[in-house]
Amino acid sequence: GIALTFHHHMGTVVQDPDEVERMMANTDPEYVSLLFDTGHFTYCGADPLEMVKKYVNRIKHVHLKDIRPEVVKEVKDNDLSFLEGVRRGAFTVPGDGCIDFDPIFKVYEGYMLVEAEQDPAKANPLEYAIKARKFIREKTGL
C-alpha cells in the first residue's frame, strides 16, 4: 500500500503545534508519517527542535528552511497574509536566518531537502543553493 507523509504548512488546516498534535494523535503511525518543515514551524512561533524530538519516529522527511525573523515580525505586526510574508522574504535557506539547526541535525538523521521559498528575482537561486550547501557541509560534514 501507500503510506502518507503529511506536510504541515502555514496557510493550511494543519500548520501549528496543536494542529499537528491533533493530526498525529488521530492517525495511525503505520499509515501516516510527518514531513517536518523547520521554516513553517518556526514561522508559527513554535520550537522546531521540540517537535522533531516529539515525532522523530514518525518523521520520514524534513524540509530544511530558515526564516528571517524581522520579516515574520513585520508580517504579523501588520496582519499581512502568509503569502505576503513569502513575497517579502520571510523564508531563506538554512544558515541565513535564525533557526539553530545543530540540535535538529543531532536528533533527525533521515531524508532532508533544502527549501527556501524565495523570489528568484530577489535571491539568486544558485547563490543561495551554494550558501545552503556550504552551511550543511560545515554543520554535518556531509
Features from the language model and the residues they span:
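Catalytic P-loop NTPase motifs of RecA-like helicase/translocase cores
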Residues: 12, 41-42
